[in-house]
Amino acid sequence: MSAQKPGLHPRNRHQHRYDLAALCQTTPELTSFLIRTPAGEQSVDFANPQAVKALNKALLAHFYAVTHWDIPPGFLCPPVPGRADYIHHLADLLGETTGSIPAQATILDVGVGANCIYPLIGVHEYGWRFTGSEVSDAAMSSAQAIIQANTGLSRAIRLRRQKDPAAIFTGIIHKNEFYDATLCNPPFHDSAAAARAGSERKRRNLGQNKDDALNFGGQQQELWCEGGEVAFIKKMIAESQTFRRQVLWFTTLVSRGENLPPLYRALTEAGAVKVVKKEMAQGQKQSRFIAWTFMDDDQRRRFITRKR
């Protein structure tokens, strides 16, 4: 039961298999979703979307002191270990300039989502302060409910409504505001049909019923946009030029390695001074994020000194 998961960041709290007894003690409702695998081991019924939601609730309570967490039906129920990996690798990136991870970093989460997952992890692990942007009223209401239900989070996480669905940073980053980093889990499909096909494929792999869509659900803005992931990130790169002196590092997940070459070309055309790729692995799943800055080494050091 103590086998290490391959590839997770060394500081990730989910290095080992889930301690289901401890998680059930934290969140008793998880108990009703435990099953026996063909090998006779106890596990969570991952084909049941309510089980996945209960597991997330237990993980957030047990490891990140989130005592109240819920999401509305139809929104993404994110895998916590993978989301934590992004936060830890981002911390390493922010620590490279000065040699230590900043304790008071300010982070912009583009598309914070109904689950508010990145701020919840980042606040607990590093004491960072987050601004979360969101185009969906329902998602924003859900995230705000999570923040208000947990003591102390309202001082560390603020939400801003993106009124222009075609904009990413514009309207969110205000004049005279400065961020150590932005992060984003972009929509990766290029159409609603492609998003449905991807969700259906995942459900089939788990033997899940068609109507049980919670853990592979997601609203339009979470799953797809015109032109897919590449088009979305290219727009992000183009917009980032406007805020080149207000943000130290712009970052985003990239779901497919084959999407990297056109993004690298866009970054070169935009005048990015430095581009970094961080590879991540959660079990068999490979993922990555790219980061870019418009500041050289001296400018990055001065930015941090002024901001602190």
From Swiss-Prot:
<dbReference type="InterPro" id="IPR016909">
    <property type="entry name" value="rRNA_lsu_MeTfrase_F"/>
</dbReference>
<keyword id="KW-0949">S-adenosyl-L-methionine</keyword>
<dbReference type="GO" id="GO:0005737">
    <property type="term" value="C:cytoplasm"/>
</dbReference>
<dbReference type="GO" id="GO:0052907">
    <property type="term" value="F:23S rRNA (adenine(1618)-N(6))-methyltransferase activity"/>
</dbReference>
<dbReference type="GO" id="GO:0070475">
    <property type="term" value="P:rRNA base methylation"/>
</dbReference>
<keyword id="KW-0698">rRNA processing</keyword>
<keyword id="KW-0963">Cytoplasm</keyword>
<dbReference type="InterPro" id="IPR029063">
    <property type="entry name" value="SAM-dependent_MTases_sf"/>
</dbReference>
<dbReference type="Pfam" id="PF05971">
    <property type="entry name" value="Methyltransf_10"/>
</dbReference>
<protein>
    <recommendedName>
        <fullName>Ribosomal RNA large subunit methyltransferase F</fullName>
        <ecNumber>2.1.1.181</ecNumber>
    </recommendedName>
</protein>
<dbReference type="InterPro" id="IPR010286">
    <property type="entry name" value="METTL16/RlmF"/>
</dbReference>
<keyword id="KW-0808">Transferase</keyword>
<keyword id="KW-0489">Methyltransferase</keyword>
<comment type="function">
    <text>Specifically methylates the adenine in position 1618 of 23S rRNA.</text>
</comment>
<comment type="similarity">
    <text>Belongs to the methyltransferase superfamily. METTL16/RlmF family.</text>
</comment>
